Structures are given as structure tokens and as C-alpha cells.
């Protein structure tokens, strides 16, 4: 199915009580779900894509869903408990290729979808600490039961290290100013421990606003990525994902910022090329054959979807198919 055909596929409406994921119709079209196929939703969230896959599967089809967020897992287990076609895994993205292979799925997956970033329920719950628009503890962990919160990270790092995080993971031009403001507040005995406290610090530190963007946007992105090791998780996931796919199996990844999308783009490019071979080797040896074929160009949300869901503006869907 071409990129144009993916975009043209009519999107099924989720029910009034469910949230439509970004690029819902395009992602499901990209997977080209067969009724008897085996599919993986690597980032369940609240199950929007999973429901769409299940609607297209027959009685012999199988769906594996995974997430590392305990609330998402509880939702999946409650919602999918009565469907014998489904298996729910609690797993970080990086662990998923190994866990699925242990379940006997190596070279057996017909389609795998990864919708990167945070889900709407995570953003909307102030207790999770992801949003600068709602006051709550400065947490930002995808799994609140493990690891270091954003507040703890900011209390531990030096100004130089905080600036490095903001610059590298948020592409923040004012990283130095913001880092110094955070450390000054910390030294004064008032470190940012809530989302609004951090947002106010950033607003005061940044000399001018970008039109249409809150000054704290890049800071919150950078801290979330750092707290959850999102880029490391993505890299390790991509390293093992091809071996899961059956020949002709599809990989579909939705990214929400350039740091993620560049990684996915480079991965597909490398896996779909044979590299630089000397002229004396006119036919690539077996070990150098391309393993993926990119399907069309990157896909983005149209104006109608962006109007209904502003988060869709930055989403990019890339699709590739395993060759052998």
C-alpha cells in the first residue's frame, strides 16, 4: 500500500468514550492488518490503536500489547481480559524485542506499531507531572514505581549538566539561563518540586517568548526524555525489532519530535541499504543485503486532524517492510 493509499483509507471513529490516537487511520492502514495475522502494539497507552487492530483481526489473529506505565497496563488488562486473541506485557520499549522473542514471536510478527512519546491520560493527570499547564509534583516518570523523578534529577545535577540536558534533549537555546535559574532557586532553599514552579522559573529566565509556544515547552520535553531514557529506549528497541518481523511484516513508528524522528529515519535508511561496497563486489553478499524496504515518504496529520488535536501537528509516521 502506497503512502497516498494509507492517507486515503477512511478512519474508523473510536467510540465517544475513547480517545482517538494521532494518525489513527494512517497507522492502521500502514499495518495492513490480515485477519489471521500476528500484531504488536508496543505502546498501548489507552488502547486506541489496539482496538483498531482487533476490529480488523479474525478469530485466528493475535495481538500483543505492551506498556511500562502501570495505569496503562491496568487499563489493558481490564479492557482486554475477555479477548483470547490478546496478550498483555508489562515492558519498557527496549526490553520488548527480547521478551517477544522469548514468547516465540521471532520472525513471526506481521505488523508492529510504536506510538512514541506521552499519552493524553499521562498529560491530563496532574499527579504525573508531565504538563506545565497543570500543577502537580514534578515527576515525569512513565513508571512512577521506579527510577528518578524530574525533581530529584534537578536537585542532583550541576548547572552545567542541567544545561546539557536542556540543550541536547530539548534543543533549548536558553539552556544556560534556565539552568542557572534552577540552581539559584535550589541554592536559595526553594528548588522546583512542582510543575508550575518549574514553569515559572523558566518563564522568568527566558528573555522572550516564541510565538505560539510556552517558554517551558522545550525544558519539559528535555526533562521527560532524560528521566525516562526515551532515546536510549528507542535505540535499543530498533536494534532488535527487525528480527521480530516476518518477511513482509510492517514496522510503523510515530514520532513527535525531531530527536526521535531522526533516529527512526536513519535506522530505516541503514536497514534498507547495503552500505558502501567496493567495485570489486558487484553483488552484495548475503550478510550485506538490505533487510527493510521503506514504504512511501513520512506521513503527517492533515489540517482537519490538527484542528481537532493540536498534538498531531508534530507527529510523523514512518513505515518500513521486512524483506527477508
From Swiss-Prot:
Cell location: Cytoplasm
What InterPro entries has UniProt attached to this entry?
A: RsmH, SAM-dep_MeTrfase_MraW_recog, SAM-dependent_MTases_sf
Q: What is its EC number?
A: 2.1.1.199
Q: Where are the transmembrane segments?
A: none
Give the top-rank taxon of the lineage listed in the UniProt record for this protein.
Bacteria
Binding, S-adenosyl-L-methionine: 47-49, 67, 96, 115, 122
Q: Which GO terms describe its cellular component?
A: cytoplasm
Please state what the protein is called: Ribosomal RNA small subunit methyltransferase H
Name the species this protein comes from: Halorhodospira halophila (strain DSM 244 / SL1)
Identify the gene encoding this protein. rsmH
Amino acid at each position: 500500500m502506497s503512502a497516498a493509499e494509507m492517507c486515503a483509507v477512511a478512519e474508523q471513529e473510536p467510540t465517544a468514550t475513547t480517545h482517538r490516537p494521532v494518525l489513527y487511520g494512517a497507522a492502521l492502514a500502514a499495518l495492513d492488518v490480515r485477519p489471521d495475522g500476528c500484531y504488536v502494539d508496543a505502546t498501548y497507552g489507552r488502547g486506541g490503536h489496539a482496538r483498531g487492530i482487533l476490529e480488523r483481526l479474525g478469530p485466528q489473529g493475535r495481538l500483543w500489547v505492551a506498556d511500562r506505565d502501570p495505569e496503562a497496563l491496568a487499563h489493558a488488562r481490564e479492557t482486554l481480559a475477555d479477548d483470547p486473541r490478546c496478550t498483555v506485557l508489562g515492558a519498557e520499549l527496549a526490553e520488548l524485542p527480547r521478551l517477544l522473542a522469548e514468547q516465540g514471536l521471532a520472525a513471526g510478527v506481521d505488523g508492529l506499531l510504536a506510538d512514541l512519546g506521552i499519552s493524553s491520560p499521562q498529560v491530563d493527570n496532574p499527579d504525573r507531572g508531565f504538563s506545565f499547564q497543570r500543577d502537580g509534583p514534578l515527576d515525569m516518570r512513565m513508571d512512577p514505581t521506579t527510577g528518578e523523578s524530574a525533581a530529584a534529577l534537578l536537585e542532583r545535577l550541576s548547572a552545567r549538566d542541567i544545561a546539557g540536558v536542556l540543550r541536547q534533549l530539548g534543543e533549548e537555546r536558553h539552556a544556560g539561563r534556565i539552568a542557572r535559574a534552577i540552581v539559584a532557586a535550589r541554592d536559595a532553599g526553594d528548588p522546583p518540586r512542582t510543575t508550575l514552579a518549574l514553569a515559572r522559573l523558566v518563564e522568568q529566565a527566558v528573555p522572550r517568548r516564541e510565538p505560539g509556544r510556552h517558554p517551558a515547552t522545550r525544558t519539559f520535553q528535555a526533562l521527560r526524555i532524560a528521566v525516562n531514557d526515551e532515546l536510549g529506549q528507542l535505540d535499543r528497541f530498533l536494534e532488535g525489532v527487525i528480527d521480530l518481523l516476518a518477511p513482509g511484516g510492517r514496522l510503523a513508528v510515530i514520532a513527535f519530535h525531531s530527536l526521535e524522528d531522526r533516529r527512526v529515519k536513519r535506522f530505516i535508511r541503514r536497514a534498507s541499504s547495503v552500505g558502501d561496497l567496493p567495485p570489486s563486489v558487484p553483488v552484495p553478499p548475503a550478510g550485506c543485503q538490505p533487510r527493510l524496504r521503506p514504504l512511501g515518504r513520512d506521513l503527517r496529520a492533515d489540517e482537519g486532524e490538527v484542528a481537532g488535536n493540536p498534538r498531531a501537528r508534530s507527529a510523523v509516521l514512518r513505515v518500513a517492510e521486512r524483506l527477508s
